[in-house]
From Swiss-Prot:
Residues 84-201 form the SET domain. Residues 324-361 have a biased composition (Low complexity). It is found in: Nucleus; Cytoplasm. It comes from Homo sapiens. Belongs to the class V-like SAM-binding methyltransferase superfamily. Residues 324-369 are annotated as: Disordered. There is a cross-link at K816 (Glycyl lysine isopeptide (Lys-Gly) (interchain with G-Cter in SUMO2)). This is PR domain zinc finger protein 1. The gene is PRDM1. Interacts with PRMT5. Interacts with FBXO10. Interacts with FBXO11. Interacts with multiple nuclear sumoylation E3 ligases, including CBX4, PIAS1, PIAS2, PIAS3, PIAS4, PML and RNF4, but not RANBP2. Interacts with LDB1, SMARCD3 and SMARCC1. Interacts with EEIG1; following TNFSF11/RANKL stimulation in bone marrow-derived macrophages, the interaction promotes the binding of PRDM1/BLIMP1 to the gene promoter of IRF8. Keywords: Adaptive immunity, Cytoplasm, DNA-binding, Immunity, Innate immunity, Isopeptide bond, Metal-binding, Methyltransferase, Nucleus, Repeat, Repressor, S-adenosyl-L-methionine, Transcription, Transcription regulation, Transferase, Ubl conjugation, Zinc, Zinc-finger. It is linked to In certain aggressive cases of activated B cell-like diffuse large B-cell lymphoma (ABC-DLBCL), PRDM1 protein instability has been observed. This instability, which impairs B-cell differentiation, is caused by N-terminal misfolding mutations, including those occurring at positions Pro-84 and Ile-107, and results in PRDM1 protein sequestration in the cytoplasm, followed by proteasomal degradation via a heat shock protein 70 HSPA1A-SYNV1/HRD1 pathway. These N-terminal mutations do not affect PRDM1 transcription regulation activity. SUPFAM superfamilies: beta-beta-alpha zinc fingers, SET domain. One of its GO terms (cellular component) is nucleolus.
Length: 825
């Protein structure tokens, strides 16, 4: 019996368990039903099951171990304490670091673990610097609903430690979404002391646009093994019976070109420029465990995104799915949690700060052994076949043993109709500082030297086989962008499409020297800048046979550094933001403005790590740390750190108020004051007290309210009458111009103390004056009050005093008071 608490069910009937701390008793079923169910489960290929079938047909349910944070004195975290009793952790050598999960005893097929526990984020609430290595996507009605983040060990369970499977042969768990939860199902019996390795089920992989290796490499294992035993003279020469079939690299295939009897057939069978459904079926049939299907390697078996969808998705804020995202295959040499990731590593989650997954390859890129074993990586098809398909990004830390060679088992749809010259690849590599084994993460090769030597690399191709839709007059025009990552030029007739390639490029943070707000954004065909001819192409007139892949549409105006085309107005380019429709006088200002929407702040302060969109703002910010105030007011001799602050200050002396409210006659010296004033009309009060119902326009008002003046938590000894009166004065102050001015004062503590003192002074003086009125009425009668004169002038009213650091002249306010009519005796 298993030393865990299990629930056993058949179909949709669930039998409640009877369990104690050490043993489990299963509710028995009829022997015939039990035998039939066991036979069906053993014979079933669960890699082909849908999520509904997993939920319906699972036999055993393993719950997490109950965990109480206070039971062990806080020595363990939830992720480790929730491990079921039939599992154990796998630790790194001489370390307490968990690097995997193993079975403690035999686990039958059809057992369910879960659900996965973690922090929940929507697409809008994901923290800016969140580590997405443990993100799992939850879908509802085909749309992304939220993420489950298992990064925090204190808020997740043991399932975060399960490593992804390297190949279908090693996979023993399938991840499924049932309802709004993630569960792991055993798809094969797991013996004791075997590591649990998970991959997506078929439905889950479909939603994520991942390949499901079970369909491609495990369906016809018997057929593959039998094909190895078929007698063939040529096969026996290349592959003896006791040796696995040899795999040809592209470099070896190209060398066979000189032998018509072999090379010609290989070209026809493996490197055809067209792809059909028959090719896809052949590929599925020829899959085998000897050549596992790894998600990090690009297999472009899906159609590219339509061009209309691409155009719509280039606007900010519109999410588009990627075809294949980062996979969960860990590096074999780095078994730390940083090398593990949830299988959901989307390219959209890439940010300038999220680079933990980009580790160094375990095999040196310059080693002779690597070049000999994986020569196809330097061949004309190598990097193109692996890295240039739209939306795919093979990572550079993928172990070489997991990268299959190109041979007869990988048919023609994996290769474009013609390759990129090796010199072109070297040029791209040198420009980007990437070695030839880097596989260009999120970067497709640029066809810098499309025709080396002035001829096509394939003897089977001729000018008639090239598309006729593009003219040959631009054949020598080759793309040489400033930043090679910005433009893609894929082969036109293979599965590689220009629109899909453009869609695969993601925004990356630009360096301070680039000045581009969207560095890394691909230019679409509508606004690619017409390239200049290179010297190599000018010297090769016979290259007219090639096509101009980057033909510019002349009716559109735009720039490769912008993700959308620009319009013309009255014959001039209109630099308009496609998000907020704000226009600018020049392109550089528009680029800087786009960083506001993208959140990009490339200029960082080395002291406080604060980010800025412009270098000038960073330079002005440095004065905050140095305390330098080089600009002086000639009227009051007050000094300021920037000319803009001085200019705003001079408006106080001149009385200029350029910002006027459109609803009322109020005018202001600063735009921020007008913005705060508008909240009076819109009743927008963003600062809310968490203990009572009070809302305020200004943050300083809320802080004064929370300083012992909240009715839910009042200061000790404060009468209710005084508390009510103080809150009334806080609300009056909140809607005054003084609150707008104090909002800009840097010393927040002094502002709160000044406001609190003034409000208390008002309340105290009102109480004193009320007592004086009552005393005068009693002792002197009503004659004084009936005269209509006031006991105090407006000058006696307390005015809001600003701290010495920001003296602002205030206009005295005169309060008209009602006269008290004499009472009849």
């Amino acid at each position: 019996m298993l030393d865990i608490c299990l629930e056993k069910r058949v179909g949709t009937t669930l039998a409640a368990p009877k369990c104690n701390s050490s043993t489990v008793r299963f509710q028995g079923l009829a022997e015939g039903t039990k035998g039939t169910m066991k036979m069906d489960m053993e014979d079933a290929d669960m890699t082909l099951w849908t999520e509904a079938e997993f939920e319906e047909k699972c036999t055993y349910i393993v719950n997490d171990h109950p965990w109480d944070s206070g039971a062990d004195g806080g020595t363990s975290v939830q992720a480790e304490a929730s491990l079921p009793r039939n599992l154990l952790f796998k630790y790194a050598t001489n370390s307490e670091e968990v690097i995997g999960v193993m079975s403690k005893e035999y686990i039958p097929k059809g057992t369910r673990f879960g659900p996965l526990i973690g922090e929940i984020y929507t697409n809008d609430t994901v923290p800016k610097n969140a580590n997405r290595k443990y993100f799992w996507r939850i879908y509802s009605r085909g749309e992304l609903h939220h993420f489950i983040d298992g990064f925090n060990e204190e808020k997740s369970n043991w399932m975060r430690y399960v490593n992804p499977a390297h190949s279908p042969r090693e996979q023993n768990l399938a991840a499924c979404q049932n309802g709004m939860n993630i569960y792991f199902y055993t798809i094969k019996p797991i013996p004791a002391n075997q590591e649990l390795l998970v991959w997506y089920c078929r439905d889950f992989a479909e939603r994520l646009h991942y390949p499901y290796p079970g369909e491609l490499t495990m369906m016809n294992l018997t057929q593959t093994q039998s094909s190895l035993k078929q007698p063939s003279t040529e096969k026996n020469e290349l592959c003896p019976k006791n040796v696995p079939k040899r795999e040809y690299s592209v470099k070896e295939i190209l060398k066979l070109d000189s032998n018509p009897s072999k090379g010609k057939d290989l070209y026809r069978s493996n490197i055809s420029p067209l792809t059909s459904e028959k090719d896809l079926d052949d590929f599925r049939r020829r899959g085998s465990p000897e050549m596992p299907f790894y998600p990090r390697v690009v297999y472009p078996i899906r159609a590219p995104l339509p061009e209309d969808f691409l155009k719509a998705s280039l606007a900010y804020g519109i999410e588009r799915p990627t075809y294949i995202t980062r996979s969960p295959i860990p590096s074999s040499t780095t078994p730390s949690p940083s090398a593990r990731s949830s299988p959901d590593q989307s390219l959209k989650s890439s940010s300038p700060h999220s680079s933990p997954g980009n580790t160094v390859s375990p095999v040196g890129p310059g080693s002779q052994e690597h070049r000999d074993s994986y020569a196809y990586l330097n061949a004309s098809y190598g990097t193109e076949g692996l890295g240039s398909y739209p939306g795919y990004a093979p990572l550079p830390h993928l172990p070489p043993a997991f990268i299959p060679s190109y041979n007869a088992h990988y048919p023609k749809f994996l290769l474009p109709p013609y390759g990129m010259n090796c010199n072109g690849l070297s040029a791209v590599s040198s420009m980007n500082g990437i070695n030839n084994f880097g596989l260009f993460p999120r970067l497709c090769p640029v066809y810098s030297n499309l025709l080396g030597g002035g001829s096509l690399p394939h003897p089977m191709l001729n000018p008639t086989s090239l598309p006729s839709s593009l003219p040959s007059d631009g054949a020598r025009r080759l793309l040489q962008p400033e930043h090679p990552r910005e433009v893609l030029v894929p082969a036109p007739h293979s599965a590689f499409s220009f629109t899909g390639a453009a869609a695969s490029m993601k925004d990356k943070a630009c360096s301070p020297t680039s000045g581009s707000p969207t560095a890394g954004t691909a230019a679409t065909a509508e606004h690619v800048v017409q390239p200049k001819a290179t010297s190599a192409a000018m010297a090769a007139p016979s290259s007219d046979e090639a096509m101009n892949l980057i033909k510019n549409k002349r009716n559109m105006t735009g720039y490769k550094t912008l993700p959308y085309p620009l319009k013309k107005q009255n014959g001039k380019i209109k630099y308009e933001c496609n998000v907020c429709a704000k226009t600018f006088g020049q392109l550089s200002n528009l680029k800087v403005h786009l960083r506001v929407h993208s959140g990009e702040r490339p200029f960082k302060c080395q002291t406080c790590n604060k980010g800025f969109t412009q270098l000038a703002h960073l330079q002005k910010h440095y004065l905050v740390h140095t305390g330098e105030k080089p600009h002086e007011c000639q009227v009051c001799h007050k000094r300021f750190s920037s000319t803009s602050n001085l200019k705003t200050h001079l408006r106080l002396h001149s009385g200029e108020k350029p910002y006027q409210c459109k609803v009322c006659p109020a005018k202001f010296t600063q735009f921020v004051h007008l913005k705060l004033h508008k909240r009076l009309h819109t009743r927008e009060r963003p600062h809310k007290c968490s203990q009572c119902h009070k809302n305020y326009i200004h943050l300083c008002s809320l802080k004064v309210h929370l300083k012992g003046n909240c009715a839910a938590a009042p200061a000790p000894g404060l009468p209710l009458e005084d508390l009510t009166r103080i809150n009334e004065e806080i609300e009056k102050f909140d809607i005054s111009d003084n609150a707008d001015r104090l909002e800009d004062v840097e010393d927040d503590i002094s502002v709160i103390s000044v406001v609190e003192k003034e409000i208390l002074a008002v309340v105290r003086k009102e109480k004193e004056e009320t007592g004086l009125k009552v005393s005068l009425q009693r002792n002197m009668g009503n004659g004084l009050l009936s005269s209509g004169c006031s006991l105090y002038e407006s000058s006696d009213l307390p005015l809001m005093k600003l701290p010495p650091s920001n003296p602002l002249p205030l206009v005295p306010v005169k309060v008209k008071q009602e006269t008290v009519e004499p009472m009849d005796p």
